C-alpha cells in the first residue's frame, strides 16, 4: 500500500490518504486478496485493520501473530470456487518493521510449509503469496514445491513472461515493487489430473508475429503479401519465418489442455480509466499535494 516501509516526515497524511484511496477503489472492482507485507504495515497495524473494516478488502497472512494472545492477526488463507475449480490462496512475509512491538512474525518458511501441507489435499490449485526478496527465498523454493504458483513482492526485478515456466515446479512470478504494472495470470483447466503448462511465450509469439505480418501487409492491403515483396527475398524469408512461428505457437496452444499465461499490463496514460473514479482520484491527488505542503511547513 505504501512506497516504503516508513512514512516520510511531513508526508504521513498524504501517504495514508493515497493508501486508503487505492484500497477503496480496488474493493469496488471485485474480490482482491492482499498478502500483508512490510510495506503494508508502514502506518501501523490499526491503520490496515481499519481499512479492512471500512472496505471490502481482504488481507491474508499465515505468519503474523498477536504478541499478547498468539492469535493470527489476519485470515490465514482463502479457498475460492471458480467454475468447479478450488483455488487456495495464502500469504507469508519474511519480516516486518522492527518497531512493530505488538506483532510477532513466525518463520515464514515453516509456516508456508505448514499451510501447503494443510491446503494441498483441499484444492486443485494452490497459490502462495510471498513478501520477500529473491536472495532470501531462493534457497527455500524446493520446500515450497507442492504449491502451484508463487507470486512474490519486494523484489526489484520482474518476471519476464516470455521465459517459459518449467513444468513440474511452482510457477514463480516476481511482481516488482514500483506499482507501474499490474501482473495478470489467466488459467484454463480442462483436466484436473493433467499438469498445467505455461503458454505465455507462445501467446506472445503468436501476437507479436501476427502484428509484424499485418505491418508488412499494410504496404498494399489489396495484394497478397508474396506479390508485394516478390522482389525482396529477405522480406519473403521473414514472412515465412513469422508464419511458421505462428503455426508452431498455435499448435501448442491448441493441444495444451491445461493452460496458464502471465503478462504485465503497464499502468500508463494509454490505459482506459473509469471517468468517475479518475475524477475522484484527481481530487485526492490535489488534496495530497496540499497535505504535503502543510506537513512540510510544520516539520521545517
Residue ranges and their predicted role:
Residues 1-300:
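Acidic, metal/ion-coordinating pockets
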